[in-house]
């Protein structure tokens, strides 16, 4: 059973995939999207779901520090609902507070250059989100 983890932003979607046992998350790719034009990367996500035989998708839910959900969180909830309808899969929302900061710290501690960090930060945030979900099981 593989699980896909997504960090949905305004310009990109970071993608992570679990191993078949559901123990570890690994960064897969970053999908460029354009919300204004209605391009959300659903075609590519659908391809990945088929290619890796995904059973479940975990979408990061950006909450405010006080636990409330703002406009970005609402957009992510709508993204998840659209995926659920399109792919007919279980789509779970997962609190992603501070996931990007955690990913940034991991990359800095690994001595990754600023330029390279910018290229992989969304994918790493998806790893942090998915690994948090996997660790909770």
Swiss-Prot record:
Bilayer-crossing regions: none
GO MF, one example: nuclease activity
Any one biological process term the GO annotation gives: rRNA 5'-end processing
Pfam families given in the database record: RuvX (PF03652)
Compartment list: Cytoplasm
InterPro entries according to UniProt: RNaseH-like_sf (IPR012337), YqgF (IPR005227), YqgF/RNaseH-like_dom (IPR006641), YqgF/RNaseH-like_dom_sf (IPR037027)
Keyword hit for Cytoplasm: yes
EC number: 3.1.-.-
Record's GO cellular component terms: cytosol
Chief location: cytoplasm
Keywords: Cytoplasm, Hydrolase, Nuclease, Ribosome biogenesis
Function, as annotated: Could be a nuclease involved in processing of the 5'-end of pre-16S rRNA.
Protein family per UniProt: Belongs to the YqgF nuclease family.
Protein name in UniProt: Putative pre-16S rRNA nuclease
